[in-house]
């Protein structure tokens, strides 16, 4: 109930200062645990002599009385910074589906299965203050949604800069990112930040698992994917010379007076000079949907009669690979870990097992 105590200094500065305690944040003796109303409806069935199995589940999770800061309380009533109350509310819902088909045709066997998951939420109440513009509100929007500026390309001349709204982040020059003035007040600032894309957590995740076998030979594959997800590229991906580093090959497509239709803004080694270009915007937040061939395995299981002669219970030769192919519009880095510091690992394994 007492979120914080701070030191209160009294007296003159002679010798060692004596410390004491003051009340910094008002307590709330009426706090309670958050509450939830949860609904789950599901089915689990097998059909066609157990060759087809299906599982489906719908869930709804409405939480209220969440412990959040009430920013609507005026400071006129006293020091109420970070005063928390049970006023938060968020509603979530989604669906999980999975299915698998197994069958045989003569000496052939095969299976194909899939999973699908969708979830989303809506922030109903969080104690935020009234906003001057509808697009600044968090209430009524999904939790964790990306917000930023709308990038409108690059400034190509000083005349274009003079005729444009003032960008308040740092001094700009030709080659810097030009942002859209959403509220039309003649300057670019936090009031021009709008929802862009989705959040970092995918709303949709899915997988496909399939395989075929014939007289000891088998091929299996697993595909995984995600959709309705947006990620911000890290500084090292977007900005050359970050942390005294180098310039990467993909960053060579930078703005120059002779190359105005570039992917990246002008080159600079000064952090302050490029502060304008480092803002969260549609330039560095992109859709990170992907489909990946996660694993692929080709194998042969030797017949039991053959390996019994050498006193083995089982012998398998296989070649497997991991993260072999990824289909995505999210360039340069792994869409699941968008940093050049964490490259996607592709691996192959060729083993004998017994």
Regions found by a protein language model. Give the residues of each.
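Bacterial peptidoglycan biogenesis and beta-lactam-recognition machinery
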Residues: 49, 58, 217, 223-230
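Outer-membrane beta-barrel transmembrane strand signature
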Residues: 15-46, 53, 141-222, 265-295, ...
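Extracellular/periplasmic, surface-exposed regions of secreted and cell-surface proteins
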Residues: 1-144, 280-352
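A surface-exposed, glycine/aromatic-enriched loop/edge motif typical of exported proteins
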Residues: 1-11, 51, 122-178, 234, ...
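Intrinsically disordered, low-complexity regions of eukaryotic proteins
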Residues: 8, 46, 98, 173, ...
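Tryptophan-centered motif/residue detector
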Residues: 33, 80, 101, 179, ...
């Amino acid at each position: 109930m007492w979120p914080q105590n701070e030191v209160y200094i009294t007296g003159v500065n002679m010798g060692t200062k004596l410390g004491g305690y003051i009340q910094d944040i008002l307590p709330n003796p009426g706090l309670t645990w958050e509450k939830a109303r949860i609904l789950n409806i599901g089915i689990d069935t097998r059909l066609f002599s157990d060759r087809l199995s299906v599982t489906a589940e719908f869930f709804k999770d409405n939480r209220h009385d969440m412990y959040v800061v009430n920013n609507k309380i005026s400071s006129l009533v006293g020091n109420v910074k970070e005063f928390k109350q049970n006023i938060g509310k968020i509603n979530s819902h989604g669906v999980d589906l999975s299915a698998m088909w197994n069958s045989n045709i003569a000496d052939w066997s095969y299976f194909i299965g899939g999973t699908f998951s969708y979830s989303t939420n809506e922030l109903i109440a969080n104690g935020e203050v009234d906003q001057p513009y509808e697009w600044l509100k968090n209430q009524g929007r999904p939790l964790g949604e990306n917000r930023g500026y709308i990038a409108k390309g690059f400034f190509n001349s000083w005349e274009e800069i003079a005729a444009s709204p003032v960008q308040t982040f740092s001094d700009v020059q030709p080659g810097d990112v030009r942002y859209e003035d959403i509220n039309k007040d003649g300057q670019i600032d936090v009031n021009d930040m709008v929802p862009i894309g989705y959040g970092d957590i995918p709303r949709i995740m899915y997988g496909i698992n399939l395989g075929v076998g014939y007289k000891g030979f088998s091929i299996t594959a697993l595909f995984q994917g995600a959709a309705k997800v947006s990620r911000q590229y890290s500084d090292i991906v977007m900005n050359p010379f970050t942390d005294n580093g180098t310039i990467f090959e993909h960053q060579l497509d930078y703005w120059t007076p002779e190359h105005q239709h570039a992917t990246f803004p002008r080159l600079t080694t000064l952090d302050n000079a490029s502060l304008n270009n480092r803002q969260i915007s549609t330039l560095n937040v992109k859709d990170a949907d992907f489909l990946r061939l996660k694993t692929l395995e080709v194998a042969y299981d030797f017949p039991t009669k053959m390996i019994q002669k050498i006193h083995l219970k089982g012998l398998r030769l296989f070649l497997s690979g991991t993260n072999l192919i990824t289909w995505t519009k999210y360039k340069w880095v792994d869409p699941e870990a968008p940093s050049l510091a964490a490259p996607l690992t592709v691996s192959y394994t060729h083993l004998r097992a017994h």
